[in-house]
UniProtKB/Swiss-Prot annotation:
Gene3D superfamilies: 1.10.3380.30, 5' to 3' exonuclease, C-terminal subdomain, P-loop containing nucleotide triphosphate hydrolases. Monomer. The gene is hel308. HAMAP family: Helicase_Hel308. It is an enzyme of class 5 (isomerase). Residues 231-429 form the Helicase C-terminal domain. It comes from Pyrobaculum calidifontis (strain DSM 21063 / JCM 11548 / VA1). A motif (DEAH box) lies at residues 143-146. The lineage of its organism: Archaea, Thermoproteota, Thermoprotei, Thermoproteales, Thermoproteaceae. Keywords: ATP-binding, DNA damage, DNA repair, DNA-binding, Helicase, Hydrolase, Isomerase, Nucleotide-binding. ATP binds at residues 28, 46-53. CDD domains: DEXHc_archSki2, SF2_C_Ski2. SUPFAM superfamilies: P-loop containing nucleoside triphosphate hydrolases, Sec63 N-terminal domain-like, Winged helix' DNA-binding domain. This is ATP-dependent DNA helicase Hel308. Its EC number is 5.6.2.4. It comes from the Archaea.
Amino acid sequence: MEVSELPLDARLIAVLKERGVGRLFPPQVEAVRAGIFDGRSVLLCTATASGKSLLAEVAAVKAGLEGRMALYAVPLKALAYEKLVHFSYYRGLVKVGVSTGDFDSDDRRLHEFDVVVVTYEKLDSLLRHRPNWLGLVGVVVVDEIHYLGDPRRGPVLESIVAKLRHLGLKTQFIGLSATVGNAGEVAAWLGARLVESSWRPVPLREGVYHGGVIRFSDGSMQRVNAPGDAEVALAVDAVAGGGQALVFTNSRSSTVRLAKAVAKAMEAAGLVPRGAKALAEEVLKASSSKIIGRELADLVARGVAFHNAGLELEVRRLVEDGFRRGLLKVVVSTTTLAAGVNLPARRVVVADYERFDPALGREEIPVLEYRQMAGRAGRPGLDPYGEAVLVARSKGEAEYLMERYVRGQVEGVRSHILAEPNLRAHVLGAVGGGYAKSLDDLVDFFSNTLGAAQMKTSLKLSILRSKIGGVVEELVEWGFLERDGDFVYATELGRQVARLYLDPEVAAGYIRLIKSLRAGNVPAYLYVVLTAPDFPRVRRGRADKRVVEGILAALDVEEDEEFEDLARTASMLMAWIEEVDEDVIYEKFDVAPGDLRVYVDLFQWLGNAAAKLARLVGREEHGKRLEVVTARVVYGVREELLGLVTSLRGVGRVRARTLYNFGYRTLEDIARATVREIASLPGFGEKLAESVIEQARQMLAEGLRGEV
């Protein structure tokens, strides 16, 4: 089928042709015949690089051109910004926006956009706020819909579908995934037509490596002559053959170790590419850690990189872009980042099929996850084939890996929404958002979830009612709901908890701790916010004595193992807001720049939520001070610098401290300065000095005077 045959606006067809899209792939033709451009709901379960995302983008833009809105939901912030770049092709046709944060907002200005890219959680949060523009939504796309089986994100997706059904919106639903074991069941639940295909633009060969040989599933064998450990040999062999390699391993330390080993082997084999030095300089400049930045930049200059959650988003993007441009020949990534790494390579090497889970110990990765990694093999237009290779340590393990992963069936997604913690949050969300006013309403609401669809029993409704009733009683006990017979109402506190997108149990814990505070101090406020299980616990380093004393002076808490972990984590953040050098923090507490960013982002949400809860329960002073502590965590500064970092673009914690120490402490001080004076300060150049002075003068002209 030719693109010109599609039932699309001529302008949209012209953009597709400009992108080099002339003929559709077979799975795309199936999707068109299933009605993806006729408003039909469709579940696309087709191989990586088969063009499903392109169709979803076009359907979203088509809706915009027809005067309707489209929401494009993705599981990760990183994917949201990547998708925004994809939509830039259509910027002459539609306005595209992105919304990933601030759950306590209805984002009423989003109606100004034709297409909005959102994270799952942000979309669910928007549906709880029920902004007026929801009636304009004509298309909802859910990328990576296999996340329905994720214990945390799956219930969010189910809740989104239940809310859309309750609102009665005539919305076209488009689900995308390369890997859903029970696609028919999911499509039936969604009321969508299923398009399922294993067709790929580049043939995929899957096999297992052991003893210097790759044994492929079709019975063929390939000897690998490159020296070194299995993972290194497989990567270097791919590069020697003119390809690129993507290696997945199970820990951050392994990504660094293997990347160094690959770089050394590539040097020995004379395979170091040219042209990556400029990229290495960009990596060094973008990294907030001089130590990690230098370590990574040294590898990048030799055509290799590690890629893990410890790296900042900007650094990860530089690595990904360098790989796509061919400047990097090998990237070694953690298996946990496989979903967010959209990097095709001739050879994908799965070095570890087990990983460590703090709660479960060592566990095997699911077949679904292996398929996600294997799907990256083969660059359309560049590679004649793609290879996905698992590494075995013994002959017996090689046979096991072949049966379990290469020949194995992808697991079906199973719902987790009826598990008590998830049910609790989504019951409150349904009542607080106005989707249910009685137990009967709640039963109806949750009857629309995949969890209900997967309950194969005639007692389904009575089981649902019993589960929901128990959760309602708990929410009443915490003061979030009130019950009058069968009727259920959200209290003002409950509505706010739902709007803040808080786990009710976390909110109840925050309220209890805030009410019990004997005195307010920074360590105690850090401790309160960090009690949410969303925060990873810092396991290394020693808790600051002053932090421990501050917590114990304000709260009656037991000094157990959990307390020690929380006190250590609070100590790490205390060092951050006391402006300790970042590399010192990373080394002392064994955290990385990407970890710190996670803490900061979470604290911005949960710290502000705790401040609002404090005010709602009559603890105004604690609310004010929690807001200040949260702002300090967001910017990593002492309190006296908050005005500077919040007022001036281009001025972070280091430059703000420089300004302050050199006597530029107010907007007036900066506005009176000359460009030469500011430009002479460490970390400032002429261009930034001009910008900072202009910003200060403009703010003063608008009436923002005094201490900042």
